From Swiss-Prot:
This is Nucleoside triphosphate pyrophosphatase. InterPro entries: ITPase-like_fam, Maf-like. Its EC number is 3.6.1.9. The keyword Kinase does not apply. GO terms for biological process: nucleotide metabolic process. It catalyses: a ribonucleoside 5'-triphosphate + H2O = a ribonucleoside 5'-phosphate + diphosphate + H(+); a 2'-deoxyribonucleoside 5'-triphosphate + H2O = a 2'-deoxyribonucleoside 5'-phosphate + diphosphate + H(+). It comes from Caulobacter vibrioides (strain ATCC 19089 / CIP 103742 / CB 15) (Caulobacter crescentus).
């Protein structure tokens, strides 16, 4: 029996690595969604950061599923600082300002996954994690940015929890895969139920 084909509507290397390491056979494609325009529209309608992650994941999955067979996974993650959506930094100066803004605070990461088939969503999940950033020194921050460089611009919080970025935190509550941007366990259950993984 052949497995249901799976497409990941994402170019995120972190999400691709998570699925690959979990043993999921998939093909990754760019979703071709203008995320900035979509976010701006959703923010204008006072949509919460949690629901923005869900809406963007759905847009990606649905768009790609109109062109690809089988199951299409769309995913998105937002950073929620006291109800305010925080976007990825565009430069190292912005990354420094972002990390200073997060210093000594607690924020949430909302990670959404939507699976679509034939242009319509058929499954979704949004999971959240709470992360408390320690009151690190300016000197530590400068060294961290110097060592990590442009890699910080790929993460919404300007940290890579799977590497040295874990040192930014004094408390983390939530699932590791949710923090990395792909709530995995529920997704794997769904893929098994729909013939994309062997049981």
């Amino acid at each position: 029996m052949s497995l249901t084909p799976v497409t990941l509507a994402s170019q995120s290397s972190a999400r691709q690595m998570i699925l690959k390491n979990a043993g999921v056979a998939f093909e990754a494609v760019s979703p071709g969604v203008d995320e900035d325009a979509a976010k701006a529209g959703l923010l204008a309608e006072d949509v919460t950061p949690r629901d923005i992650a869900d809406a963007l994941a759905e847009m990606k999955a649905v768009k790609v599923s109109t062109k690809r067979p089988g199951l299409v996974i769309g995913a998105d993650q937002t950073l929620d600082l006291k109800g305010r959506l925080i976007d990825k930094a565009g430069s190292l100066d912005e990354a420094r300002a972002r990390l200073l803004e997060l210093r000594g605070t607690t924020h949430k990461l909302h990670s959404a996954v939507v699976v679509a088939r034939d242009g319509r969503p058929i499954w979704r999940i949004v999971e959240s994690a709470k992360l408390s950033v320690r009151p690190f020194s300016d000197a530590w921050l400068d060294r961290y940015i110097e060592r990590r460089g442009e890699a910080l611009l790929w993460s919404v919080g300007c940290y890579e929890l799977e590497s040295e970025g874990v040192q930014l935190f004094d408390k983390i509550e939530g699932d590791y895969f949710t923090i990395l941007g792909l709530p995995l366990v529920g997704l794997l259950d769904f893929l098994r139920l729909h013939g994309a993984l062997t049981v």
